[in-house]
Regions:
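Short, low-complexity, polybasic intrinsically disordered segments
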Residues: 268-289
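C-terminal motif of bacterial Sec signal peptides marking the signal peptidase cleavage site
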Residues: 17-21
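A short, acidic, flexible beta-alpha connecting loop/helix-capping segment that sits on the rim
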Residues: 295-299
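Conserved active-site loop/cleft motifs that coordinate metal ions or position small ligands
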Residues: 255-258, 289-294
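Feature marks hydrolase-like catalytic cores characterized by long aromatic- and Gly/Pro-rich stretches
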Residues: 31-33, 283-289, 327-331
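Hydrophobic helical h-region of N-terminal Sec-dependent signal peptides
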Residues: 10-15
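Chitinase-like catalytic core of GlcNAc-active glycosidases
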Residues: 23-211, 215-242, 251-255, 261-275, ...
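Bacterial N-terminal signal peptides that target proteins for export
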Residues: 1-9
C-alpha cells in the first residue's frame, strides 16, 4: 500500500491460534466508541500516522493500523512516513486521540514507498531496536509488517527481519505480529510464501497474515469482491500447509485488506457492495479482521467520480457518502 505522501500513481504455528489447531480533515463524521459485537471479525483500518481525517472513526474500529514507519534515508532510524521522528509531538497527540474511543493502535512498518528498516539496518539487533523504538513511541504491543514489491523479493532483508522480530518477541513477551502481503486470486506468490517460511525458520510467532486483496493486474477486469474471496480461499489452503493449521485456525489467522474505490490498476474498482460482500464472508469464516486502504480515501472526490483511471490518495473515486466503506467493513 502506498505512503500517504506518495503522489497520485497510475515451523512456528500462528501464535494466537496455537490452542485451536496448530499441528506442528474533517468531513463531518463524528467520533464513535467501538461497538459491542458478537462477531469475531474486527474492523482495523489503515490510517495516516501524521494526518487526521473525519472518517477515521467511522465504522467504530477496534484497532487502527498506523501507517507507516520506514527509514528516513539510508540509516537505521525509524521515522513516521520517513519524515517525522518517533518523538514528534503531533504524531503522539494523534495517537492519543485515536485511543480515546477505546481502540488499540497497531504500528505498521513498511508499505509500498520508501525504505523498510530491514533494508537499511545493518544487523538484527539494531533492527529490533529500531522496531522497538517505534512500538514504544506508540505505546503499542502490536506490530504489522507490510512487505511488498522489491522489498518482498529481497531475501537478505526478509531473513534479517525475521531474526529481528524473533529477537524482539523474546524481549517483549506478548508482542503480536502480523504480516501484510500482496495476494492474487491464485493466492500468495513465491516471495510471500518464502517470507512466511523464513518466519517459521526463525521461530517468529505470527498472529495474523493480512492479505492485500487489491491491485492484481490489468487482465483482472471482473468483480473485485469475488476476486477478494477467491484470493482468500487460495491463501487459506497455503496457510494450512505453511503453518500446519486446521481449516478453522487458518481462517482465524487471516485478515483481509481492500483498496477502496479505484485501485492503482486501471479497470479495478472496489465498490461498497464489494465491501459488504467481504465483510459477510469474513464473518462467516471467522476471519480475524478486515481493513481498508484507507480512511483518508473514504470519501467521494470533490468533483464526483473522476474520469481518470488513476487512484487518488485522498478520495475513493466512486460515488459515496463520507465513511461509507468503513461502515460496511465495520459491520
Amino acid at each position: 500500500m502506498r505512503s500517504y505522501l506518495t503522489p497520485v500513481a497510475g515451523l512456528t504455528c500462528l501464535f494466537a491460534l496455537a490452542a485451536t489447531g496448530c499441528s506442528s480533515m474533517s468531513d463531518g463524521t463524528s467520533d464513535a466508541a467501538p461497538k459491542a459485537s458478537e462477531s469475531s471479525t474486527s474492523y482495523a483500518p489503515y490510517v495516516s500516522a501524521t494526518t487526521a481525517t473525519g472518517t477515521d472513526s467511522a465504522g467504530s474500529p477496534a484497532t487502527y493500523n498506523l501507517a507507516f514507519v520506514i527509514s528516513g534515508g539510508s540509516d537505521c532510524t525509524p521515522r513516521w512516513d520517513g519524515m517525522f521522528g518517533m518523538d514528534d509531538a503531533e504524531v503522539k497527540s494523534r495517537i492519543g486521540k485515536l485511543r480515546k474511543s477505546g481502540a488499540t493502535v497497531r504500528v505498521s512498518f513498511g508499505g509500498a514507498s520508501g525504505k523498510e528498516l530491514a533494508t537499511t539496518c545493518g544487523n538484527a539487533s539494531a533492527l529490533a531496536d529500531a522496531y522497538g523504538k517505534a512500538l514504544d513511541a506508540a505505546g503499542s504491543t502490536q506490530a504489522d509488517f507490510d512487505i511488498e514489491g522489491r522489498t518482498l523479493a529481497d531475501s537478505a532483508s526478509v531473513d534479517l527481519r525475521s531474526r529481528a522480530i524473533a529477537r524482539l518477541q523474546k524481549q517483549r513477551p506478548g508482542l503480536e505480529v502480523s504480516f501484510t502481503l500482496p495476494v492474487m486470486p491464485s493466492g500468495l506468490d513465491s516471495h510471500g510464501l518464502a517470507l512466511l517460511e523464513s518466519a517459521n525458520v526463525h521461530d517468529v510467532q505470527v498472529s495474523t497474515v493480512n492479505l492485500m486483496t487489491m491491485n492484481y493486474a490489468e487482465s483482472y477486469t471482473g468483480d473485485m469482491g469475488d476476486y477478494a474471496l477467491t484470493a482468500a480461499k487460495a491463501a487459506h489452503t497455503q496457510l494450512k500447509k505453511v503453518f500446519g493449521l486446521s481449516n478453522a485456525a487458518a481462517w482465524e489467522g487471516m485478515a483481509l485488506t481492500s483498496m477502496i474505490g479505484a485501485n492503482d490498476i486501471a479497470g479495478e474498482t472496489f465498490t461498497l457492495e464489494d465491501a459488504a460482500q467481504v465483510r459477510s464472508f469474513a464473518e462467516e469464516k471467522r476471519i480475524a479482521w478486515v481493513s481498508m486502504w484507507s480512511t483518508f480515501r473514504d470519501r467521494q472526490c470533490e468533483k464526483g467520480v473522476p474520469s481518470r483511471a488513476d487512484a487518488a490518495t485522498d478520495c475513493s473515486g466512486v460515488k459515496q457518502k463520507p465513511g461509507a466503506f468503513a461502515r460496511e467493513f465495520g459491520g
